[in-house]
Amino acid sequence: MWRIRRPPFRHILFYTSSSKMRHIADIRIAEFDYPLPDERIAKHPVEKRDECKMLVRNGQGHITHHAFKDLPSMVPQGTMMICNNTRVINARMKFQKATGASIEIFCLEPISPVDYAQMFQAKGSCRWSCLVGNSKRWKDEPLTKTLHIDSRDITLTAHRIGPHGNSWEIEFAWDDDSLTFATIIEAAGYIPIPPYLNRLSEEVDSIDYQTVYSKIKGSVAAPTAGLHFTQEVIDRLIANGITMRELTLHVGAGTFQPVKSETIGDHPMHTEVFSVSRRLIDEIIGQLTAHRHIIAVGTTSVRTLESLPYLGALIMQTPDIKPEQMHVDQWNPYQEQFAQFDTLQALQTLSRWFESNGIEVLTASTSIMIAPGFHWRIVDGIVTNFHQPQSTLLLLVSSFIDRQTTIDKQAISKTNASDGATTSEWRQKNADDNLSKPECQQKDESDNMESPECESSNDTKLEWQQQDNSDNKAKPEWRKMYDQALANDYRFLSYGDSSLLTTW
């Protein structure tokens, strides 16, 4: 049993009044706009993944510029870094009608079998929710495509069953029952690169648009924050005392869905399926208990991790909830009934629920919206790219860097109940927790500026960016950061450069 010393009431509760809920829903997406020239959108990655640029913004708002390969020297020992190990599938398939018309089918999510693992092992036939390009030219006739697999000709047939929400239900069938759908889609389709790249998929995208640690097939878009990692960077992180862990969230096409409403309250967040193990839940509990940092690699990892306490809260409200009912709604974090719970208690409840249901891995779903005013409970560091103007991902970034004191890492005694440190206090006592900053992040106390040794310890020049106060006073923090990235020739979006955002 975890020994928890409850902090004062104000440190564990986050009360969301109806007025605050209205304020969050009334946030105008136009406030999250910025000029992004097309030439700043990276069409391809840099030649070596870890040689892209990396902007580092700390909890005091100081910004330095590095190469991504410097990441291991930026992260304190004892930190847990959590990556999304999903793998992008060849989700786009082109069929040619006898008339010559080209029909494109874009697989979104499985219908039958509904489980991703079972879907890719399906033989003979399966059904998907799909988008259809040039749909008006496709009547009721089946579409066929000849595939060449292991020196054999395989016929793949697509039948349009009917509407499925905002998409179509498509049945795929193939004339060799020995082949799985994983083999079929690998041969029939191609990687669905983001639409804003304004180019066709290339053969090299099948490598470039996958993370080096991708394992579990199911995404139709890459968790792009992870594209910069090389095995060398991962090995150095581990050697420096960083715990590397994985979860799975299958990225859907909704990640590219623009916000069309004037306010975010009218924007329906897309739903994505994720999987987490009981072991990871228990390790997160241990990390929070020991006051150690948790860095999420990418916004998909953020959404998964920050959804976990709300799954625990759902169980506390409905103890007999079934696995298939485990879903976090986009507004749950801002509703009063989900505000007044302790994060660790919720996670421990979730861990016990795993045991009582006899499962080791939970598959659930989330449509969580992380916007300014969100109560961050788990993540206190993010590795992320630079996102599109007026996107929900930009809302997430703004929420994180403006969070200040809203983190809910409780003041838990490390060894006994006599330690009364609050969440904010333990960050000042990081030496006792072996959380001292890496040398290249230490500052000279005499002038509060970076030491010369730090500058010489990296291949890239480390420079505190001086800004015109009169020009920046009215700008939100996210905009100041993005302006610096633009001014320093950063490349944006999926194949672009990286950033490390921390609260310390």
What spans do the regions from the language model cover?
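Ala/Thr-enriched low-complexity intrinsically disordered regions
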Residues: 16, 405-406, 411, 415-417, ...
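Low-complexity, intrinsically disordered or signal/transmembrane-proximal segments
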Residues: 11, 15, 404, 410, ...
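N-terminal mitochondrial targeting presequence
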Residues: 1-21
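Acidic, glycine-centered low-complexity repeats within long intrinsically disordered regions
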Residues: 420, 425, 431-433, 439, ...
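Intrinsic-disorder-associated, low-complexity terminal segments enriched in Asp/Asn/His/Tyr and depleted
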Residues: 11, 408, 432-434, 448, ...
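Surface-exposed, charge/polar-rich loops and edge strands
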Residues: 21-409, 463-464, 468-504
